[in-house]
Amino acid sequence: MNLQEMNARKEKIRNFSIIAHIDHGKSTLADRILEQTETVSKREMQAQLLDSMDLERERGITIKLNAIELNYKAKDGETYIFHLIDTPGHVDFTYEVSRSLAACEGAILVVDAAQGIEAQTLANVYLALDNDLEILPVINKIDLPAADPEMVRQEIEDVIGLDASEAVLASAKAGIGIEEILEQIVEKVPAPQGEVDAPLKALIFDSVYDAYRGVILQIRVIDGSVKVGDRIQLMSNGKEFDVTEVGIFTPKAVARDFLMAGDVGYVAAAIKTVADTRVGDTVTLASNPATEALEGYKEMNPMVFAGIYPIESNKFNDLREALEKLQLNDASLRFEPETSQALGFGFRCGFLGLLHMDVIQERLEREFGIDLIMTAPSVVYHINTTDGETLEVANPSEFPDPTRIENIEEPFVKAQIMVPNDFVGPVMELAQRKRGIFLTMDYLDANRVNIIYHIPLSEIVFDFFDKLKSSTKGYASFDYEISDYRPSNLVKMDILLNAEKVDALSFIVHKDFAFERGKVIVEKLKKLIPRQQFEVPIQATIGNKIVARSDIKALRKNVLAKCYGGDISRKRKLLEKQKAGKKRMKAIGSVEVPQEAFLSVLSMDEE
């Protein structure tokens, strides 16, 4: 292809993604677009084709990014090349959204005709606006009885400030309005900028590990072109690799001769470890490198940490391999080895949020068959010590001695909660209970309110979302971003079983709630830990002070069963003997702690 043909081809390219709140019909719309453009034959069509992980289909959420090339013959008789880049809609995966948006020029905003705009839709729209994308509103599910497209249209204009007069009314399920959406993409989404003959510059927006070909990079070529045999260089670390294959996805990988400016596709280059390829890095040619890297890429910092331990201690290396493999596809997962007296060897893992943590745990168990114990998630605290040091601690068992602590700062988030009018009371009550600080409240329309709070991340970490859903009958939607660190009156609480500290059960708690939390946990553990042959005291302590205690009574055999009538001194002798045996057992006995016990530290309801 000569330069002229390449430029003509570039004018026909449209790169776009679909933004939507969970369940507003994004994956279904993507399916319809694939059918309409005949990318996938009816025979291969399965619901949510782009959600290729089993877990995604089951939970009905999109986690990883998928990029697909489609050909669309428009009404003007020309054939256009569409690249549809699927984005996850869940708050934990905002970074994945931001990188897929960086690879696009346009975005389809899908809003449910019955539910209107939700908090996460807003968050993603702002990301799209930051990337200067052309946004095409689509009002989906207009065939629902409760649909009110006109109200939603007004809402898009009022809340986001987009002109929604030309918003397409669609039903992805019934296939209504799909043609219109495709025509709007042709007309409104700009063709890619970028020079075909400039030095290669391409953005990595995802990487997938393949056992045979090594790491496969998903890239959006901004300038230049790349073909098999080129030697590429990664700009963040200067490492070089030889390209062995380039191609596109039509969901299936199809090899091509080259990729040029505007294209979205994949490159395989015998890259052994995914650690070499950072998502958001810039790829260029070693022989003719670009002068500067693409901007807008940041390292993701995990916000939530938890210990992951294999139940069988000989599976430690399998767990390490499994985590390394997951990390190949998941740039935001961090882990380092740690040991616990109670649980043996395992890893401290960092996650973007709770859903991310859940998904990783499920994938470890499902794809690698490893049985795990997870400890309670915690956040990163900043501890200022009396000798002027600042420590960053994510694991409660690493907290320094209380006498050395000057003060502790914890991360706060700015939480945006959208909720129907009737539930404002319960939501505010919940936020206050979680130590939230009220900021503002805006009425979006006559019956929906947007409430903004500052809440400590540690309070959101375990059950805030579930509580929010149950106190608003599932109507609230919620989005948060990290705001800053603030000093808080926090203490570390340890749990002692049989007078031994179980490090995996330690947690950090606000001083005002310490007493009742201690009480709740001790009672919960009493129910969860099976009775032993000897009595087990459970104590909650802060420093050396015991704040709550409960005892698990011993199981005992009735040693008097074979004394009929019998002499009292004979009975006493047997009982004394039993007591001495129990005492010996208690001295050497260890207590088995079931997985539920670790999780009970999390679900700290005051029930």
Swiss-Prot record:
Provide a GO biological process annotation. Answer: positive regulation of translation
InterPro entries the UniProt entry points to: EF-4 (IPR006297), EFG_II (IPR041095), EFG_III/V (IPR035647), EFG_V-like (IPR000640), EFTu-like_2 (IPR004161), G_TR_CS (IPR031157), LepA_C_sf (IPR038363), LepA_CTD (IPR013842)
Q: Which SUPFAM superfamilies match?
A: EF-G C-terminal domain-like, P-loop containing nucleoside triphosphate hydrolases, Translation proteins
Query: Mind telling me which SMART domains this protein's record contains?
Result: EFG_C
Q: Which PROSITE patterns match?
A: G_TR_1, G_TR_2
Report the domain of life of the source organism.
Bacteria
**Per the database record, which ranges form the tr-type G domain?**
11-193
Cellular location(s) = Cell membrane
Q: Which reaction does it catalyse?
A: GTP + H2O = GDP + phosphate + H(+)
HAMAP family associated with the record: LepA
Name the PANTHER family for this protein. Answer: TRANSLATION FACTOR GUF1 HOMOLOG, CHLOROPLASTIC, TRANSLATION FACTOR GUF1-RELATED
Q: What is this protein called?
A: Elongation factor 4
State the organism of origin. Lactococcus lactis subsp. cremoris (strain SK11)
